[in-house]
Amino acid sequence: MLDLFGYKRRKTSVAQIGDTPLGGDFPIRIQSMANVSTMDTQASVDQAARIIDAGADYVRFTAQGVREAVNLQHIHAGLCRLGYHIPLVADIHFSPKAAEEALLHVEKVRINPGNFVEMKSGGNLTEEEAFDLGHKAVRERFGSFVEDAKRLGRAIRIGVNHGSLSERMLTRYGDTAEGMVQSCMEYLDVCHEHEFDDVVISMKASNTLVMTAAVRLLVERMDAADMHYPLHIGVTEAGDGEDGRIKSAVGIGSLLADGIGDTIRVSLSEDPEHEIPVARKLLAYIEKRNGHPSVAVPQPDRYDRDKLRRQETYAVGDFIGSKHIPIVISDRRQGDDHFDTELLPDIVLGADGRYYREDMLLENIVFRSIRQDDLTDDCLQTIEAISDTVIILESVGINPVAEWRAMLHRLELAGCRCPVILHRRYDCTDLEDLQLQASADMGAILLEGRGNGLMITADKLPSVAVNHLAFGILQATRLRMSRTEYISCPSCGRTLYNLQETVARIKAATAHLKELKIGIMGCIVNGPGEMADADYGYVGAGPGRIDLYKQKICVRRGIPQEQAVQQLIELIKENGDWKER
């Protein structure tokens, strides 16, 4: 059972992946994926070497067909000649034959339940008959694959993607976390029947709410079935730069904080070796909590992660709490008076220690800063006696997620309905460190439906950057849009254009369209699905060709790559969503 008020890794079985086992008491592993062509042996070897030198435990390559799967043996041999002996992973979509070939050459093969056994509905079958027929095909085809893996001593990752669920699962369960879990469990049951334990599971989505909900639901289902397979954690299509780091830290960090996860990948639209130090920083930050005691709370079993408490608070000042969007308070007690006029905080905590909104002193609102040790019965009575109170919950301990939960739980047990602002002081001197730490900490609570706002104190960093981060965390948790949302994949060997360059060009042209979501995807495997809630999409369709989407519908096909960004702009203008700078 997970400890919501402390840190303890979830107990999992061990999956043997070459000489680098996963799960159990082994360290949480870090990995990345190559983005060069798998048929370019030298480029693949060189890139894998850079990823390994950065600290990766595993390196994954796409194998979209049998010939790519065959070439994995040459990549493996090239790495061995250079003295690199870590396990390689093949990433398979749509081609069971490629998966079977890959088993001969690498230590682990990732398959996608959404497209491993392709079953199209048709004929005169009822929905139930079609579902059962597909289930039978999965048992037969995947069962045979599992037996091959057992015979060869290979591991399998069952990699479920929100954007590529099978037609069967979508028809029955919809585009939901439940659909992802059912898709996974169908394949896990086959592994269980064949007594195959070298299994790793991933449940990925670009939406942090969907991803974390799916992982937590899967853990519950596995525990109920006495299954304890290790988990690969990641947010797919997280993007690049600050946004990619924030979104990854919110999703991965909130699960790691509860001890969930045996290997992680931070998927960035950057060179893959850049992912590794980010993952290492995030993991090291969470693991500092290991060995520290849990926070003592009354009636811990009554803490309900899934009940949305945010809207149960009352409104203060007509803009805080209740159904109002979460706010950002900027701590300017150190005297910094620089602001980004396009992204102003809702409230400023001034150098005089008082709270201001649009330069007006908030005289009629009581801001009460409280730490864990302050939250006594007398304190609670005082809070309840004063109307228009906003509680600033300040975490000062090693485990802010557990500390905030404990304080929120105490307030909820007492029936306190004051709006709550999450606050923590960070001693970071590096902005990336702050992005990862604050996103993991505050994101975990926001994803639970708690917290009416944020205040991040980081005196050693520019206040404008800290303010920007706070808004980024609210956007990554899908609570408040303040900038253009980019859903961009990290690219892989299936991508046939320069994704990093394209992301930069699209951002330069559209970053001022702050209410839009734009998907930028390397190929069709996850593209249309993962960007399903995007307003517009840019998807690789073949060598030098791009398809453009309006929401879920492809509206322009096979556009030459050199014209595609301009045509995307024209498409946005045609639909009335363009604004001049």
UniProtKB/Swiss-Prot annotation:
NCBIfam families: ispG_gcpE, PRK02048.1. This is 4-hydroxy-3-methylbut-2-en-1-yl diphosphate synthase (flavodoxin). SUPFAM superfamilies: Dihydropteroate synthetase-like (SSF51717), Nitrite and sulphite reductase 4Fe-4S domain-like (SSF56014). GO terms for molecular function: 4 iron, 4 sulfur cluster binding; 4-hydroxy-3-methylbut-2-en-1-yl diphosphate synthase activity (ferredoxin); 4-hydroxy-3-methylbut-2-enyl-diphosphate synthase activity (flavodoxin); iron ion binding. The lineage of its organism: Bacteria, Pseudomonadati, Bacteroidota, Bacteroidia, Bacteroidales. It catalyses: (2E)-4-hydroxy-3-methylbut-2-enyl diphosphate + oxidized [flavodoxin] + H2O + 2 H(+) = 2-C-methyl-D-erythritol 2,4-cyclic diphosphate + reduced [flavodoxin]. Its EC number is 1.17.7.3. It is an enzyme of class 1 (oxidoreductase). Binds 1 [4Fe-4S] cluster. InterPro entries: Dihydropteroate_synth-like_sf (IPR011005), IspG_atypical (IPR017178), IspG_bac-typ (IPR004588), NO2/SO3_Rdtase_4Fe4S_sf (IPR045854). Its cofactor is [4Fe-4S] cluster. Belongs to the IspG family. It comes from Porphyromonas gingivalis (strain ATCC BAA-308 / W83).
